[in-house]
Structure formats: structure tokens, C-alpha cells
Amino acid sequence: MKIRSQVGMVLNLDKCIGCHTCSVTCKNVWTSREGVEYAWFNNVETKPGQGFPTDWENQEKYKGGWIRKINGKLQPRMGNRAMLLGKIFANPHLPGIDDYYQPFDFDYQNLHTAPEGSKSQPIARPRSLITGERMAKIEKGPNWEDDLGGEFDKLAKDKNFDNIQKAMYSQFENTFMMYLPRLCEHCLNPACVATCPSGAIYKREEDGIVLIDQDKCRGWRMCITGCPYKKIYFNWKSGKSEKCIFCYPRIEAGQPTVCSETCVGRIRYLGVLLYDADAIERAASTENEKDLYQRQLDVFLDPNDPKVIEQAIKDGIPLSVIEAAQQSPVYKMAMEWKLALPLHPEYRTLPMVWYVPPLSPIQSAADAGELGSNGILPDVESLRIPVQYLANLLTAGDTKPVLRALKRMLAMRHYKRAETVDGKVDTRALEEVGLTEAQAQEMYRYLAIANYEDRFVVPSSHRELAREAFPEKNGCGFTFGDGCHGSDTKFNLFNSRRIDAIDVTSKTEPHP
């Protein structure tokens, strides 16, 4: 057993209001520069819908993630090394700019410079930020399907409608929607790392964050196809790939990510999970896709177990990280209460950004008397949001974990309602779903109140154990995301070990 630690995230979809504050703040901090205008490290999608980029969940089209071969071994869906090499100069599974959107701005200056006395009112026409040319029509945007925008025929192409009678959901009275914030999953078994020909993508041991070394990246873009969540973007200005860095400078300082800090609905939780690195391959190679969720739970370790603590210390896990893991809200929601579920575990990447399924539309229908009662709790199998849809999204089609999570949240609400409104303690609903009163009270504190100190338990990192920080702090100045350019000479005042980046954006003079 080799114990490693990972900073994970849980998003409570029951409370997401679709305000896109997380997307805007992330955009302003990380991708508000030339080359990545179309890139959104964090975006909020409306489900059902094809998402961003279009139809990203269709792995038959994009070939992302892993597949299990007949001999039980894993292989990138793109193919083995020889197949990857054959596609390196012409990747047929790479999403194009039209699958995202053509980034644009408007000619606002035309409003100021238009001649006076014109017969028509001046307008600001759209202009492409890539080509600089005017666009006749805006065909798509970063959030084109927001709040069920568009006709149902396009929304029905959502892969999560598999095994569902989706025709009935085209009728207005049966319409449903939910918000799905997405970011890099920082997987335990990342397919992007395996598909990078340059070896530029790596997973940090101390916190599990997956990063792209901008000095090693050569812009092959195989990682974009390899990532099943399509959360790696190509910077056309620098010629390198970029992705969500989980705000690692803030994580190292013990602070939450920007998207978590600015979340209006308090839906994001950050915490440490201890896991057995030796069990990753066995878990990801599970034959039945529906068992992948449980196999990933088996990889996680109990931070309160004395044997786990002893082994973690031997493996170099700092005591502050172990203490943070014992207070982790992510561990409570994923392991203790089993409310949080992974996004598309069938991709076999073992994602580390998990989701609590939405309950609000269900509870509203129950209050209105539209659902029959099954004992104390409403019949959650007759929901407005189909359970099978949530299962296709979160548990590879297995409805049992989804039903358990929904029933436990309903039971907690029933218990607290009886306590606060009726002034009595009614534990029948809790007994039905296997919860204690102490667990229900703690769930209420974390889910409903969601104080800052409960949502974010992030220990400051011990980077001093990894390498000398002085050369790294002083040897690299300001950068605009295209790598750290050092001196042209061999002499380096700061004794930094960084390799100078290759300038792929320099323009050469044309031959006469």
C-alpha cells in the first residue's frame, strides 16, 4: 500500500443557481488573454444539452478516456502508442473551433466614429478575435444552451438520454433542467497524461493536481482528444495546451480555488482525500462499468484509521495533511454519507471532482402532492428529473447510488422540518435510509448552512520539502501563460533548473 493525498472537490448541484459567477471569475483570472479567448477552465452547462464543446460526452466521436481490453489491461480509447504516433500529424478526433465557438468582440468604435446625419443608426458588428475579420452571423457562444436555449431536437442529442424514453420530455409539462458546473477532474488515472507524446503533463504527488509543463509542451494536442471531459484547450498564440490548474498557488497557501471562493450558492467544497496509489490500476480495470463507482470508493482510505495514519507518515504525508483529511468535507460527502458521486466514471479516469445530485425539483413536486408516498419519504423513482438520467451522468447508469443519495437528502429535510416546524423529533425517515441523528445534524450543517470553515479544509503545502524555493521565486519573472523565458546566455544568477521555453510565436521576415 502506497498512500498519497489529493485535494478533491464536491459540488452540490442541489444549490447551484446557474449564475456563472465561477466561470466569470475564473475567466478573468486565468484565460483573459490572447490565444485562449475561447477557453473556459470552468463553465456551467444546462442539462439536458450537448454541452461545451458540442457533444463532448460522445466518446465514440472524440475517443477520450480509457477502454478495457480483453486481457483486462487498460488502453487509451485513442489507441496504443503506434496508433497515437500514426495520428500525431493529423488527429481525426480533435474538436475544431466550431465545436467550441468562434470568439468574438464588437466594433464599438463604430458607434463613436459613425458620420453624423446618417439615415440609419450605427451598430457594433461582431468581429472574430482569431482572424480579426467581421462575422456575418454569430453561430455559437460559450453558453449557447443556457436555460434550455434552443429546440428540443438538439437538446435530445445529450448522451445521458440513453435508455430513456426522451420523446415525452419534449412536452412542456414534462420539461426539466439542471445546472452542471464543469472543470478539470484532476483524475487519479488521467488519460491526458498517457496520451501526451512529449510527457509534458504530470500529476503532483503532494496534492494530486494535474498540470501541463509549458516548457515541455510541443502542441501535439493529443491530450485534448485523450481527455474525455474536454477540459484541455490549445492556445493558438503560444502553440501550447493549457488547462485548469486548480488554482494551485492558492491551494499551496491553504486557500480555496477562485471558483470556490466566489461561488454565490456555496455549493463547492474542498478537502483532502487519502488514497492507495497501488490500487488505482486495479480499480480502473474493473470489468463492469457500473462497479467503477464502488471500486473508486475502495481506493480511498479512512484518515482516522491508526494503521492508515502510521503508513501515511511512513510514505511522507505531512501530519497537517492527515489532520485536514480527518476534517475533510469531501470525505464526509463521498465516503461517510455517500451523497457525492463521480462524473462519468465509465471513462475509467477515476475523477476527483464529485457531484451531489439535485433534489430541489423533486422536493417541490412532493410538496405539491404530485408524487406518491413510499412510506415516510416520497417515491423518488417518479421524479421530475429522471433517475436514469442522473445515473447515466454520475454512476455509469447504476440507479442505486443515485436513489440512496436522493433519499438521504430527503430524509434529512424531513427530520429537520419536523424538528423546526413541528417541534418534535421524528427519526422514521432517518431509520429508513440508514442515517443517525448526529449524521443528519452534520449533513444539515454542511449542506444547508455551509460555513466557510466547513466547506474549505485545505492545508498549506510543504513545498520546501520538494526543492529550493528561492531559485524558482526569483529566477522567473512575469509570464503571460506562454512559458517562462530565461536568459539567452548560459549564466543564470539564480541557479534555476528551469529549461528555457522555445518561442514558437516569433515571426520571421518574408523572403524578398
Features from the language model and the residues they span:
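Non-ligating segments of multi-cofactor redox enzymes
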Residues: 1-512
